[in-house]
Curated annotation (Swiss-Prot):
It comes from the Eukaryota. It catalyses: N(6),N(6)-dimethyl-L-lysyl(36)-[histone H3] + 2 2-oxoglutarate + 2 O2 = L-lysyl(36)-[histone H3] + 2 formaldehyde + 2 succinate + 2 CO2; N(6)-methyl-L-lysyl-[protein] + 2-oxoglutarate + O2 = L-lysyl-[protein] + formaldehyde + succinate + CO2; L-histidyl-[protein] + 2-oxoglutarate + O2 = (3S)-3-hydroxy-L-histidyl-[protein] + succinate + CO2. Its EC number is 1.14.11.27, 1.14.11.79. The lineage of its organism: Eukaryota, Metazoa, Chordata, Craniata, Vertebrata. This is Ribosomal oxygenase 1. PROSITE patterns: JMJC. It comes from Mus musculus (Mouse). Residues 256-401 form the JmjC domain.
């Protein structure tokens, strides 16, 4: 399908393809959600009791479940039933909206790594929702798009975890998220048809892409790819250097699809969208944008190593999705090479995506896409869960477990039998030698003992540290900005700085800036707090950022991390002295990692 940011740098692997074919047969459009099944697959640090009791008292409330107002039918296709097809309707492509503000650069000199919600909402180019009590349908008043409405709603939700859950609920609506995770995630292709062309309005448009080409340093190969799929072959036609409008649009007119890698580096709204959702997944969330000319296909059939959510923004596109061809391709860990049409069977899903529609499919599902009927297509692919499997976790755990077992248990240091090569190895695989049976039993016993030595928490911390480094910097709500160092009224005025000197006291109530903004990790006998507030919107442009936490402040740091979103008095932090309490809280506040219950007043 498409290509997303990958482990190397710019994107998790993904593509987008299709091929000219006859129109799919029509079918009734009564169902708004279509789920297509794949065979399901099965898949410590010591803390003081005082700190633990405080955390128990400050335990965060559980998320409310929110029912969707929409009523939909859910259709499943199982076994070898006839593949679904959607009616290809003649409808106008979405007009690109005018850009009211120039997109931000992807360079290392971004003016602000942490930006406020209200400032980003202004980039949507649509009217803000009317205040309570006003007349939303007043003649002449532009209506806010569903996207801007939900972003405005998120700005009023104090918990970052609840914001992530709400935005994901909106993305799937009317499909309930709990049903999606329980029955469809990693198992089935899902189509959500909304019949609302404005649903994603303001997220990204062809006008945004044109503005980026004009005003930003967009480079072919690094930020933008030009590709086409003709006569069963994929071609990439990237010239060297900057992707100026004349070159990019000439390639588009020549039938090339344009793939924008890592649009979150340029688009504040895409950044905002992904920065919220990454907390929902607990895994890096990336994206690519694909603009495909009418009557063309940009990419060959293939599968990817990420969970893919396709958001149709403009125009229409015919998609064909195929099951993994054999069990080895289910939940694939690497992306496939390009396939020919002869490699494919019958699609399990054949449908035309319209603006506002959503398509999801798991890793290993082969897909291709093409534009037809003289209409272009613009879609954004959101990707996540690259190399985030049990196998990847165990791949990190087991070598460390073996190393620890060798050091701590003499049974792992005993020598192999002198004659083991006489009955072990491929040439002896059919041997009934009892020595072979004994050898295999010994291996099983030792492997079973490895669980005792497995450093599961240490590996979990390392993966959490990697996720912190992968993450986008946080986008702040108005409340988070006002109550953190980011909103202090310090400024230069009349020849001198004013409003300087705001200080925390033992009575100040604080909590972390957001839920997923930091992680405490032990390394080499020292403690470090890795955080996202100084990350770049460009993948791994910066080295991991961290603060060293003194051992006497470790329990206090853990309390702050675990008690979010409840407030804690600085004087209640489990430290040995008031000095330790204030120094920890002040360091975190000054770094932008902590917010207060009420604004600090400069002295």
């Amino acid at each position: 399908m498409d290509e997303l940011p990958n482990g190397n740098g710019a994107a998790l692997l993904k593509r987008g393809r299709g091929r000219r074919r006859r129109h799919p047969q029509s079918q009734p459009r009564g169902a708004s959600v279509l789920a297509l099944p794949l065979r399901p697959r099965k898949i410590r640090r010591h803390r003081k009791s005082a700190a633990a009791s405080r955390v128990a008292a400050l335990r965060a409330r559980a998320l409310r479940s929110e029912d969707s107002d929409s009523k939909v039918a859910v259709a499943s296709v199982r076994g070898k039933r006839k593949r679904p097809a959607e009616l290809l309707e003649a409808s106008r492509s979405a007009e690109p909206r005018p850009v009211s503000a120039r997109p931000r650069s992807a360079s290392a000199t971004l003016p602000s790594r942490v930006e406020g919600w209200a400032a980003l909402s202004r980039n949507l180019g649509t009217a803000a929702p009317p205040p309570p009590g006003s007349h939303a349908d007043e003649p002449g008043r532009p209506r806010a798009s569903p996207l801007q409405q939900v972003l405005t709603e998120l700005n009023g939700i104090p918990s970052s975890r609840r914001r992530a859950a709400r935005l994901f609920e909106w993305l799937l609506a009317p499909l309930p998220p709990d049903h999606f995770y329980r029955r469809l995630w990693e198992r089935e292709a899902v189509l959500v048809r909304r019949q609302d062309r404005s649903y994603y309005e303001g997220l990204f448009s062809t006008a945004d892409l044109d503005s980026m080409l004009r005003y930003e340093d967009v480079q072919f190969g690094q930020h933008l790819d030009a590709a086409r799929y003709v006569d069963g072959r994929r071609e990439t036609l990237n010239p060297p250097g900057r992707a100026l409008p004349a070159a990019a649009w000439s390639l588009y007119r020549a039938g090339c699809s344009l793939r924008l890698l890592c649009p979150q580096a340029f688009s504040p709204t895409v950044w905002q969208f992904l920065a919220v959702l990454q907390e929902q997944f607990g895994s890096m969330a990336g994206s690519n944008v694909y603009l495909t000319p009418p009557d063309s296909q940009g990419f060959a059939p293939h599968y990817d190593d990420i969970e893919a959510f396709v958001l149709q923004l403009e125009g229409r596109k015919l998609w064909r999705v195929y099951r993994p061809r054999d069990p080895s391709e289910e939940l694939a860990l690497t992306s496939s090479p390009n396939f020919s049409q002869e490699d494919l069977g019958e699609p399990v899903l054949q449908t035309v995506l319209e603006p506002g529609d959503l398509l999801y499919f798991p890793r290993g599902f082969i897909h291709q896409a093409e534009c037809q009927d003289g209409v272009h297509s613009l879609h954004l692919t959101l990707s996540t869960y690259q190399r985030n499997t049990w196998g990847d976790f165990l791949e990190a755990v087991l070598p460390l477990a073996v190393q620890a077992a060798i050091e701590e248990n003499v049974e792992f240091r005993r020598g192999l039998p002198r004659d083991f090569m006489d009955y072990m190895g491929a040439q002896h695989s059919d041997s009934k030698d009892p020595r072979r049976t004994a050898f295999m039993e010994k291996v099983r016993v030792l492997v079973a003992r490895l669980g005792h030595f497995a450093p599961v928490d240490a590996v979990a911390d390392q993966r959490a540290k990697d996720f912190i480094h992968d993450s986008l910097p946080p986008v702040l709500t108005d409340r988070e900005r006002a109550l953190s160092v980011h909103g202090l009224p310090v400024r230069w005025e009349a020849g001198e700085p004013v409003n300087v000197g705001a200080q925390l006291t033992t009575e100040t109530q604080v909590h972390m800036l957001q839920d997923g903004v930091a992680r405490l990790v032990g390394e080499g006998g020292r403690l470090f707090l890795y955080h996202t507030v100084e990350n770049s919107r460009v993948y791994h442009l910066e080295e991991p950022k961290c603060l060293e936490i003194h051992p006497q402040q470790a329990d206090a740091m853990e309390l702050l991390l675990r008690s979010y979103p409840e407030f804690v008095r600085v004087g209640d932090l489990p430290c040995d002295s008031v000095e330790d309490q204030l120094s920890l809280a002040t360091m975190l506040y000054d770094k932008g990692l902590l917010l207060t219950k009420t604004p600090l007043v400069p002295s």
